[in-house]
Amino acid sequence: MLTFLSNLNNMIIMNDVPTPYGVYFQDSATPNQEGILELHDNIMFYLLVILGLVSWLLFTITRTYSKNPIAYKYIKHGQTIEIIWTIFPAVVLLIIAFPSFILLYLCDEVISPAMTIKAIGLQWYWKYEYSDFINESGETVEFESYVIPEDLLEDGQLRLLDTDTSVVVPVDTHIRFVVTAADVIHDFAIPSLGIKVDATPGRLNQVSALIQREGVFYGQCSELCGTAHSAMPIKIEAVSLPSFLEWLNEQ
């Protein structure tokens, strides 16, 4: 029942999961994703203005010259208009590029992480290691995460998204994800957290996240990696620090 209510909250109150025919962003839970959404919205506004301007020009020119089919035959060259349609798009691209570069730099920057989680992609599941924590037997806390088969799904669980084991993390904590793969190229992607990083064999890629609210966040492998590519979901549970420590003691 609690699982059902939690998923209902995520789907209705917080849009943290994919929905049928959803062509929009999921609600952000990290500063990185908030920056991505803000950049997208700002760019879309100016693109709509440009679209309206270009459409108006095309309509005006078409209407004007359709009334006088002779005029365009004597217009062979227009240096002014050529300069305008060369410089104006270049300026627009520069305006878009600068905030994009700033956001890209901030997303790649790993700021004094309080903990590190290693995510290893394999065909076709994920393996996680909490490198900073050791259990009672002196081993690193680690586990594997598999998709729950359709015939074993419980009420409120999501097809091809829920897993048998979740990655539990504390909120308001700088977390570094170190991502790699053991066989082929995978991709570690969680839309609500603004995370998307390649998992490449023999290479360690890293990305940071500061989750600002509790909740359950879903992701998937976003790189075609074989026949069961769709069966590599990612499930992140963000909880309070006391709840995280309690979970950690149980491992």
UniProtKB/Swiss-Prot annotation:
Cofactor remark from the record: Binds a dinuclear copper A center per subunit.
Catalyzed chemical reaction(s): 4 Fe(II)-[cytochrome c] + O2 + 8 H(+)(in) = 4 Fe(III)-[cytochrome c] + 2 H2O + 4 H(+)(out)
Entry keyword set: Copper, Electron transport, Magnesium, Membrane, Metal-binding, Mitochondrion, Mitochondrion inner membrane, Respiratory chain, Signal, Translocase, Transmembrane, Transmembrane helix, Transport
Subcellular location(s) per record: Mitochondrion inner membrane
Cofactor(s) for this UniProt protein: Cu cation
Keyword DNA damage: no
The protein, known as: Cytochrome c oxidase subunit 2
Species, as recorded: Lachancea kluyveri (strain ATCC 58438 / CBS 3082 / BCRC 21498 / NBRC 1685 / JCM 7257 / NCYC 543 / NRRL Y-12651)
Lineage of the species this protein comes from: Eukaryota, Fungi, Dikarya, Ascomycota, Saccharomycotina
GN (gene name): COX2
